[in-house]
Amino acid sequence: MRNWKYLLAVLLIMALFLSACGASAAPASNLAEAPEVAEEPAESAREVIPDEPYEAVEYSLYPAPEGGYVGDVMPFVTEDGTLELYYLYDTDHNGQGYHPIYKFSTTDLCEYEDHGMMLNFGQMSDPDPALGTGSVLRDQDGLYHLFYTGHNDTGNGGKGKECVMHATSTDRENWVKDEDVLFFSPENYSKDDFRDPEVFWVEEEQCYWLLIAARENTLGGVVLKYTSTDLKNWEVYGPIFAPMAQYMLECPDLFRIGDTWYLTYSWDCCTYYAIGDSMNGPFIAPRDNILDGQGTISGNGFVFYAAKTAELGGNTYLCGWLGRPGVSGDSGIYQWAGRVLNHQLVQNEDKTLGVKAPEQFADYFTIDKLVHAAAREGNAEVSGNNISLSAEPGSYALADMGTRPATMTLECDVTLDEGGCAGFAFGGSAQDETFTVLCLDAERGCLHYEGYEIADLENFDPTALTRFDFSKNDVHHVKLVCENDVVVLYVDDLKALSSHIFHSTDGAHIGVFANGCNASFSNISMKIPG
């Protein structure tokens, strides 16, 4: 009996002890879950950057005419330093006659005046029911000349579809066409592919040169040279450039920086260049001779096309156009003609060329905008104006910098792992939480944007890209210039990728990301117009 009572007492004591342990075990359990509880604030931190008001702006840096698009550009610098951009006016509803020549002008590459139509197309019975690219110059007597392409699909009675035509003006606003065709293509050259005359005075030879895109029967696309002393009678000289690479070398342009000569030309939906020691050549195309993007879908990849140069304030600018989107939304598919797009050329030590944003933009974007950043996905650390990202293969890290202003520049220094992919992300607003990404892709060796989300990058190939060698520098200086949907990415004053990114507008946020790699974005600064 006594043993039974003793045993019962022991059991009661043990029960009380276990009950006490159970009461104290609850807090221990909460601490074990503390990491999960601690993650809640991290989740909340991904939402701390609220949406800001967004209002689209009137295009200023990248204009287009109302109801139309900018086609091939013909730059001319006036005596007072104004840059005039004559261009082929295109629409979505061209008739039998099309591509009249219109004009913008600017003194700072930031704001443009629209002068409207300068030269209309002719009748179907004329050699020019469609106009093609040309050039403007001032002769030694002060008269202005516009040389341009006349195009008629009927073939002009067997003479050819394309010819060189001419107009004159005393004020560059009122142009008078010559009645007669200057000339058609010479013997052994295609009658239907003969266009884009570029005319200029050569002091050393005391004559005018005319360079034109032509197609020789055996050489293929060439830049053909003519000379004249009176701008009326022209003598064919022969090709100064025949790479035997492209079907045509459209919109040829010859210019000099220092003691080196350069020839730009366009085909394959992009602008190329070649280098020579003399204006007569020989010209050699560098292995990598595309400065802005190129589409990978034939006929629908006009990223930066038909660019010609203008010298302004001691700098040389490459003046062309960014094609209009070929489908709705972001795709990297761009059709012929769109918006004015100018890059400032940079001559490298090895005489190759690079591009950067026009220096005039510094006087346009004058207000510093404070950037507030926060981790959004994965391992992202923010310290002042520096962001570090780390992501294992198959995952990504993302930091959010808030609503993207309609017009802005953003500069920073970027490092990323060899073979990594990082860049800028757009989206993440209350209306659309998805992010699409503008990539610095060291794995593929290019810059690209197609409207892909981060998770889809590895499943698709780029449709609009600029080749880029990331091995040349450990740190890459990057600049974004944004105006509404137009987003231009410059890297190391070497290359650009121009895009339409609609997913970056209408209140979308801008951020930075790293996909399966480590990346850092340092010295981040954002500016908006004053």
Model-inferred region functions:
Residues L254, L410-V414, F470, D474-V491:
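Short tryptophan-centered beta-strand motifs in secreted/extracellular beta-sheet-rich domains
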Residues I454-H477:
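Short, aromatic/His-centered strand-loop micro-motif at the edge of beta-sheets
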Residues S522-M526:
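Extracellular beta-strand elements of beta-rich domains used
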Residues G22, L31-D196, W201-L249, R256-N300, ...:
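Beta-rich carbohydrate-recognition and catalytic domains
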Residues L18-A20:
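C-terminal motif of bacterial Sec signal peptides marking the signal peptidase cleavage site
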Residues L389-Y452:
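Secretory/extracellular carbohydrate-interaction modules
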Residues D493-H509, A514:
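Short, solvent-exposed beta-strand-to-loop segments that form ligand-recognition rims
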Residues G378-P393:
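Short carbohydrate-recognition loop motifs
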